[in-house]
């Protein structure tokens, strides 16, 4: 048995809480991964244009499962993207606009879009996660391929809002809790696990040859799917239950510590 693919979530997993990682250590590991024929995949709810900014030297060598699986890119080339029909998009927007407690980001292939009327605090956060972001008066007549919505709201409202969204638009989109004060609406079945499946099919890699890392609700499907799945020390109970193993904290390079074990064929990678 040999590992052929390593996939990492970013926020709360690969990145510290300061949104950094040990670049020198990782780049040394990446060279060893290449030498051992191991593919590296970034699997995140974040926008592709934001994700590539973390890996400027190797963005055209590695793969990205961006937007929670909505858009999959390998070596700079499209592998897959989901697409909401115009009718489905309009139905979702119509419902979301009846919910004043949520701020809406419509996630498209060319850009993300949010409303000009939102306050500066929301816009500052949005710009951190969406490097291509347009401010619009409304969501009518936008020409793009849409595969996700990002919703910002108060943490304490998330359980009840998720329940309400499921009842209202659950046949069109699935809500996943992605972290502090945020929910993503994704196309059913178009999640990180599906994105990894597209890449595995392309490369001829079995689930048993895959290592994944995650900490949030949007990681659960890929944690269940992979042969070697690691929930971070900072992960919630549902995520821990979905994973086979635990990794250290995202603030103490927990992912990089496990990658060292992969490269050295140490337990549990020594079968």
Swiss-Prot record:
Its cofactor is Mg(2+); Mn(2+); Co(2+); Zn(2+). GO terms for cellular component: cytosol. Transmembrane segments: none annotated. Phosphate binds at residues 10, 44-45, 192, 218. Mg(2+) binds at residues 9, 11, 215. GO terms for molecular function: 5-amino-6-(5-phosphoribitylamino)uracil phosphatase activity; magnesium ion binding; phosphatase activity. Magnesium. Can also use other divalent metal cations as manganese, cobalt or zinc. The keyword Magnesium applies. Pfam families: Hydrolase_3. Pathway: Cofactor biosynthesis; riboflavin biosynthesis; 5-amino-6-(D-ribitylamino)uracil from GTP: step 4/4. The keyword Metal-binding applies. Keywords: Hydrolase, Magnesium, Metal-binding. The active site is at residue 9. This is 5-amino-6-(5-phospho-D-ribitylamino)uracil phosphatase YbjI. It comes from Escherichia coli (strain K12). The gene is ybjI.
